């Protein structure tokens, strides 16, 4: 995310999303009753051409809308923001409806009553854009699953079968193994930065040796880590281990996975954790909350309540973290009521 301009006296911040993660962040920043301004395409009627019976001509105009609906479309790399027009050229009626299609590198200005979590998310998005993409390959002798770890969740890029089998002879297995390695390497060729190979056994080490011999340009990017499982279970191990933070710098999804893992440990010990709205409020009243954990969904539904709780937590020296429900750890927090807290001391 690029923060282009801040106009505090008007509560306006002008930004430019640079990737899909940024659009996702904006989908949680922009909400109903905010004003959003951007250059967009709008179909306008050509009043001078009475003979034409079509729907008019599309042209690029600068519009402002009062937001009514926000929808994030991962599959088409787009954020759609709909509402009534509040600013437009003279020939476009104020109060008519329009949808802004916001894509990467679309500049928009957002006018709203900025909350702490909005500004925190905006700064996180700005920092996230400076880090390389996180690519993880979880593999064994039979299959490789390749993932990119985004701020809002995990996307599976490919699942590649090796073709190695006990039913074929050793020569055929050797050929199948190298085809397997090369298919993995081809999938990874478009990515810059470090690539994490992980899994049980020696497959990760074997492909590292092959790459070191045949693809020296790629060899320097590889990091090896062991897991007990393959597939998404193996990826979950990686996210909770902290290895991604050590390689790439602090990644949002890894950070969230680790903090929810710590929460669940404390809940199992029945000590330094509380969950559910009433229990967390009680912990806040005792100034016991070290870290307040809230899902993005809970925040959307309870903004005024959350704002009051965040202020109380920060006044007592605590902090808050908003957790995405787009990944497993966020869904675990959602199952606990969408709100929990790590505590400084136990509260009865």
From Swiss-Prot:
GO terms for cellular component: cytoplasm. Monomer. One of its GO terms (molecular function) is endonuclease activity. May function in recognizing stalled ribosomes, interact with stem-loop structures in stalled mRNA molecules, and effect endonucleolytic cleavage of the mRNA. May play a role in the release non-functional ribosomes and degradation of damaged mRNAs. Has endoribonuclease activity. It comes from the Archaea. It comes from Methanococcus vannielii (strain ATCC 35089 / DSM 1224 / JCM 13029 / OCM 148 / SB). One of its GO terms (biological process) is ribosome disassembly. This is Protein pelota homolog. Keywords: Cytoplasm, Endonuclease, Hydrolase, Metal-binding, Nuclease. The keyword Cytoplasm applies. Belongs to the eukaryotic release factor 1 family. Pelota subfamily. Pfam families: eRF1_1 (PF03463), eRF1_3 (PF03465). It is found in: Cytoplasm. InterPro entries: eFR1_2_sf, eRF1_1_Pelota, eRF1_3, Pelota/DOM34_N, Pelota_arc, Ribosomal_eL30-like_sf, Transl-rel_pelota. The N-terminal domain has the RNA-binding Sm fold. It harbors the endoribonuclease activity. Its cofactor is a divalent metal cation. Its main location: cytoplasm. HAMAP family: PelO. The keyword Zinc does not apply. Its EC number is 3.1.-.-.
